[in-house]
Amino acid sequence: PSLCGSDEATPAIIPAFGIKHGGSAFVSLIQKGDAVATVHADKATNISEYNRVYPSFNITPVKYEDETLYISNTASVDELSLCYRFLTGQNATYAGLASACREQLIRNSVLSTKTVQVGDYLPFCLTLTGAVRRSFGPFSRLSALTTFEQAQDMLVRMKNKGINNVFVRYTGIFSGGTDSEDITHSSLLRRLGGSDKLDELYQYISSQKMSLFLDIDILSSSTGFSGGGSVNIKKDGSTVTPDNVLAEATGKTSAERTLAKVGKLAKTVSSVLTDTRYNSFTGFCFNDAGKLLYSDFSDGGLLRADAANAISSAISPLSTGNSSMTVNGNFYMLKNIDVIVDMPLTPSVAGSGAYVSVPFVPLVLHGIVDYAGEPINTETNLEETLLRSVEYGACPHFEWNYEPLKKDGKDKFYYDNTINEAAEFYSKATEAL
């Protein structure tokens, strides 16, 4: 759903809302229709003396553009359902609201009943970049930033500095690098070492009781799809332009990606399973599936609510018997997920003196999955980030390359520039948690 107040709508992770007043509170969970919901929140004014929070639903997709009104001939959802939980006394707290929401999500089989395995060491999430396309004037080429051998060398150094229980998310290792191509026609990049070196890396990771997650995009491609992609309500091809955190260093801005037909995901999943059956790794990291949700208006396409169910069902074979990771954390797929990275730990709207933010999502997920915020080495205030991570029960998360992208010594993604800070951060977080 989206969250809307006086400002424009921003994405919300959990389809829930509520109000606390004195010793009473309620929380409402949107059980059906959340994919097309917007939550409105308005504080009391001289016109309305009540604080208000309520949902609205975009039942029929509509778009107005170029003096033309486009209306779908199909409703987005067949049914709407909300569950209200009322709390009083000592349960009428933000923690109580989160607990009630978690209980209902587990009851609805949205969240798993499993709990996080408590080990001797705090998990440390590490995002590695395999290969990236770099611009050189009018030309561009794929450059290796972290080969499989280099990744092992980096992990050995981390181990020697006291960093244990590492969850490695390896991005940019298939065709196209970080500008990944259609996953059904992709293969491991030989310039990173190929299957043999990947297997050697996994053997080391497994022997050290770490985890290796291969990052994949199943909903988008930088090169399009052989059978065509999804289309929007205007019947134009659907695209998305993700942020490129390495843009400043690579000289390559973000590029449009074609969105896949969600109804064809079963074929995509089958291809991924076939192509990776001889590789050794812990599981997959679902990148775009953790962030994207869209309607497909092509023939036989699926609208948002049905698309959410289709994506959740599609990733099940990829996670069966294996641990899985995702990015950002779309809630409709969390039942199959063990680790979340890049989970928002700060408010999506600008702060003001009128309210304070509370860690509602971490309160709901704590103990069910391991989670981490955005990479700490991209933050400006390390001490503040440490305190927030400890308060929210989040794992440390760093994003590194083995090869520097810049030669000025200020490359925040070059691991040698921040590995000592990471070790110190990890030590403090381990003591606190």
Regions found by a protein language model. Give the residues of each.
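Generic alpha-helical secondary structure signal
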Residues: A92-A95, S99, E149, D196-D199, ...
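Hydrophobic alpha-helical scaffolding
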Residues: N91, R141-A144, R191, G301-A305, ...
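Conserved, mostly hydrophobic/aromatic
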Residues: M158, N287, S389
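Active-site-proximal substrate-binding groove within the catalytic cores of carbohydrate-active enzymes
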Residues: S6-A9, I14-S48, T68, S221, ...
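Carbohydrate-recognition beta-sandwich/jelly-roll modules
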Residues: P1-A144, Q152-V166
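Aromatic-lined carbohydrate-binding/catalytic grooves of carbohydrate-active enzymes
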Residues: G119-K264, G283, K291
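Generic detection of long, well-ordered alpha-helical segments
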Residues: N91-A95, A144-F148, S195, K412-I419, ...
